[in-house]
């Protein structure tokens, strides 16, 4: 009896499971059949090329919104902005209505967008020729006739770049959407939300979106008005990369130019250093030329700074050549030192610049008076007493010795004079180096401040 009961329970459970499975399968089959019947009913005689309205005077209201997922690139050279977006579009199709009770309670269906009438909304500022730019995904059709279609799209839109304050610049790029063929009497655009949806936005490493808003407008052509929606993206560049690898090296090069005047003029590296700095600046200019657009309307901030430094370095080379020329002057090169140069560069300016003349200046006695006196005494003695032959020989020897001493004295004085002139010109060159060191240092600091401070103030102000 117990065994029979067990067999009965097992058979009952098996039959119950089979009944549930058959019921579920029948339910699914019923839903599929209802959906198939609904699609045949909706698209029987449906013409996607005709506006789905009851009356020809009716206007289809398209609710339009934009969701940005990624700011792919901002190309200043070609003045392009590349974005990945979702286009939110919703309208009512009067030909796609049904009673859910007649089709198993189906309230919505997914339909390929190629089979539906579409408002042919395109991006007007397209730069790559793909005006539609979107993927033909499926649309959701509700029983009330409401069609919701949110295709993803990748756009390259034209954007006029203002690189005046590069790399502390801010750009305002816009995306203008509208129907390509329908005017305002057929299709009207209505903004879902004036703000661009950025919930799923993937941050860009170079640019930051400060603001992104949409605004509706109308473009008139004769008697017709064409509605459109313009989304404005306010972008701010993150300047850390360019500050570290462009601006700071340029600042370093400008201060290297100042250090040229700290090198001794005896060294031959003064001109080599200046020339190397000039070549480095030329390389930086080539790098910037590859980044910014080729425009004659504005000069970018970093371009102004590099131009300033190049003029700065060129002047330093000219001044260095002049200082080296002064350093190697002497009386033998027919450059005697004028009295005013001695007073200014050997007496006054060294005191003001806290410089000390390393030369120990001393003067030799003239010796002309002593020579005349000696000659007079010798002649007097010869007149007073008649000299013997031995005395005459001794006097002649002494006169020759005196002449030799005078020659040596004149030679020593001449060498001392030449050495003193050479050292004086070298000291004048040192004074000039010190003067130009301070002048170029002040000019470098003030020039950097005057060029960059306004841009930094603007960038910080916009940040706050």
Swiss-Prot record:
Which cellular components does GO assign to this protein? acetylcholine-gated channel complex; cation channel complex; dopaminergic synapse; neuron projection; neurotransmitter receptor complex; plasma membrane; postsynaptic membrane; presynapse
* Recorded catalytic activity of this chain's protein: Ca(2+)(in) = Ca(2+)(out); K(+)(in) = K(+)(out); Na(+)(in) = Na(+)(out)
Example GO biological process: presynaptic modulation of chemical synaptic transmission
List the ranges whose topology is Extracellular: 31-238
Q: What are the annotated glycosylation sites?
A: 55, 172
UniProt topology in membrane = Multi-pass membrane protein
Q: Where is the signal peptide?
A: 1-30
Disulfide bonds, paired cysteine numbers: 159-173
Q: What is this protein called?
A: Neuronal acetylcholine receptor subunit beta-3
The organism named in the record is Rattus norvegicus (Rat)
* Gene name linked to the record: Chrnb3
């Amino acid at each position: 009896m117990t065994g029979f009961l067990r067999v009965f329970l097992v058979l009952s459970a098996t039959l119950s499971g089979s009944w549930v499975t058959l019921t579920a399968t029948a339910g699914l089959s019923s839903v599929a059949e209802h959906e198939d019947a609904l699609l045949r009913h909706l698209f029987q005689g449906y013409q996607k090329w005709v506006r789905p309205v009851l009356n020809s005077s009716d206007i289809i209201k398209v609710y339009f919104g934009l969701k940005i997922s990624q700011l792919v690139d901002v190309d200043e050279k070609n003045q392009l902005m590349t974005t990945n977006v979702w286009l939110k579009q919703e309208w009512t199709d009067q030909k796609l209505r049904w009673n859910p009770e007649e089709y198993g309670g189906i309230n919505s269906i997914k339909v390929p967008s190629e089979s539906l009438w579409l408002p042919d909304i395109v991006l007007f500022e397209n730069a790559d020729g793909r005006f539609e730019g979107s993927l033909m995904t499926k649309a959701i059709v509700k029983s009330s006739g409401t069609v919701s279609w949110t295709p993803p799209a990748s756009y390259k839109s034209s954007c006029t770049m203002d690189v005046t304050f590069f790399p502390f610049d801010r750009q305002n790029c816009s995306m203008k959407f509208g129907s390509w063929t329908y005017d305002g009497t057929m299709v009207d655009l209505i903004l879902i939300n004036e703000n661009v949806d950025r919930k799923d936005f993937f941050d860009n490493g170079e640019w930051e979106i400060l603001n992104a808003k949409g605004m509706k407008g109308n473009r008139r052509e004769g008697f017709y008005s064409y509605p459109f929606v313009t989304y404005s993206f306010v972008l701010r560049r993150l300047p850390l990369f360019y500050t570290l690898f462009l601006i700071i090296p340029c600042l370093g090069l400008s201060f290297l130019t100042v250090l040229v005047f700290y090198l001794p003029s005896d060294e031959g590296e003064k001109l080599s250093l200046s020339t190397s700095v000039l070549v480095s600046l030329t390389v930086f200019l080539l790098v910037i030329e590859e980044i910014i657009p080729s425009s004659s309307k504005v000069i970018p901030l970093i371009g102004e700074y590099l131009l300033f430094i190049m003029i700065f370095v060129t002047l330093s080379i000219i001044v260095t050549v002049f200082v080296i020329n002064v350093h190697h002057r002497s009386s033998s090169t027919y450059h005697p030192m004028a009295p005013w140069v001695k007073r200014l560069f050997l007496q006054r300016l060294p005191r003001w610049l806290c410089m000390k003349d390393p030369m120990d200046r001393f003067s030799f006695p003239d010796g002309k008076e002593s020579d005349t006196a000696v000659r007079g005494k010798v002649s007097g003695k010869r007149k007073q007493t008649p000299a013997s032959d031995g005395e005459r020989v001794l006097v002649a020897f002494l006169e020759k010795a005196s002449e030799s001493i005078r020659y040596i004295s004149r030679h020593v004085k001449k060498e001392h004079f030449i050495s003193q002139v050479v050292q004086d010109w070298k000291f004048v060159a040192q004074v000039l180096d010190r003067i130009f060191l301070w002048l170029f240092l002040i000019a470098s600091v003030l020039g950097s401040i005057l060029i960059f401070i306004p841009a930094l103030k603007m960038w910080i102000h916009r940040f706050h």
